Swiss-Prot record:
<comment type="similarity">
    <text>Belongs to the SelU family.</text>
</comment>
<feature type="active site" description="S-selanylcysteine intermediate">
    <location>
        <position position="95"/>
    </location>
</feature>
<keyword id="KW-0711">Selenium</keyword>
<dbReference type="GO" id="GO:0043828">
    <property type="term" value="F:tRNA 2-selenouridine synthase activity"/>
</dbReference>
<dbReference type="InterPro" id="IPR036873">
    <property type="entry name" value="Rhodanese-like_dom_sf"/>
</dbReference>
<feature type="domain" description="Rhodanese">
    <location>
        <begin position="12"/>
        <end position="136"/>
    </location>
</feature>
<dbReference type="InterPro" id="IPR027417">
    <property type="entry name" value="P-loop_NTPase"/>
</dbReference>
<protein>
    <recommendedName>
        <fullName>tRNA 2-selenouridine synthase</fullName>
        <ecNumber>2.9.1.3</ecNumber>
    </recommendedName>
</protein>
<comment type="function">
    <text>Involved in the post-transcriptional modification of the uridine at the wobble position (U34) of tRNA(Lys), tRNA(Glu) and tRNA(Gln). Catalyzes the conversion of 2-thiouridine (S2U-RNA) to 2-selenouridine (Se2U-RNA). Acts in a two-step process involving geranylation of 2-thiouridine (S2U) to S-geranyl-2-thiouridine (geS2U) and subsequent selenation of the latter derivative to 2-selenouridine (Se2U) in the tRNA chain.</text>
</comment>
<comment type="subunit">
    <text>Monomer.</text>
</comment>
<dbReference type="InterPro" id="IPR001763">
    <property type="entry name" value="Rhodanese-like_dom"/>
</dbReference>
<dbReference type="GO" id="GO:0002098">
    <property type="term" value="P:tRNA wobble uridine modification"/>
</dbReference>
<keyword id="KW-0808">Transferase</keyword>
<dbReference type="GO" id="GO:0016765">
    <property type="term" value="F:transferase activity, transferring alkyl or aryl (other than methyl) groups"/>
</dbReference>
<dbReference type="InterPro" id="IPR017582">
    <property type="entry name" value="SelU"/>
</dbReference>
Amino acid sequence: MRQDDAQLRHIFLHDVPLLDVRAPVEFAQGAFPGAVNHPLMDDAERHQVGLCYRQQGQPAAIALGQQLVSGHTRRERIAAWAAFAQAHPDGLLYCLRGGLRSQIALQWLHSEAGIAYPRVPGGYKALRMFLIDTTQAAAQECDFVLLSGLTGTGKTALIAQLAQGLDLEGHANHRGSSFGQRLDGQPSQVDFEHRLAIDILKKQARGHRAFVLEDEGRHVGRCSVPLALRQRLERAPIVCLQDSFGARVERIVGDYVIGQCADFVAAHGPALGFERFSTRLLDSLGKLARRLGGARYQQLHADMQAALARQQASGDIDLHRHWIAALVRDYYDPMYAFQRQSRPGRIVFEGDLPAVLAYLRAGCG
């Protein structure tokens, strides 16, 4: 292992605090868990300096940057870096490539706040490439098992019980179906990739060389499973989790009605929260309108509206079971049956929760 790789590995295995001095727009496109953004230049300043660099060259761009970030603005930014460094003496600073921006930030921090602080060699690019390589290497070197099963069997909860489980839905902050959007939205594609790679890295450090993932397909919401991993999973053996129809419906009611409504009410209050919960549920069904067909969609939409009206009036959620049962029976279960038939020979085990847990714990250390 190269020395730089050893340092990057240490950063992610030990959750080293990271100070990101890139512009906010860059940070939003992708960073690392726990990183804090205190930029050298804001988005507008970065845009101006970039134009100057392209038109007049580096010396003029540096001079413009010094002019834009001066006086009170400069003092404020140095104060933010100093506060981070004092709170996290074990941390590191990075910019895009470990170049001018991090050099300038560290020079100012040292000369005006008296703080010598280390930076990440190669910056964000080096950190990201290390994580991309981690996922690609795991896809080539490790064993994988896909956990499949009908909608509502509790696959995600089972993954959470496995030391070697990789929770794609957790990293994507999405439950994976048309109804899977969560209140606080999804991470960027880059952030999703980073979270997954760090999870793999930490589990490998604990000795795991085989992993179990839920059978999600190419996407979890708008997050795409990394190509190297997706190609590896297309050849992975499949374990199927089974449960009764009634238990599956109750689990879906708990996740998508009780739990989701509670999240919206906690965030927005009873009235607005229920209104937004209702809108989210109806919009989620609307995403399936074309696949369901006109008559079936209209019936489910009417049933959902009736269930929401009763829930709002009395708190009774029983009517939700009707549209959920119909949607599962007439849409999700046939779709699962079709997908299963398209992958003959890959299913290596089927059973209920205790049986599948025992099988995976015994065979996927």
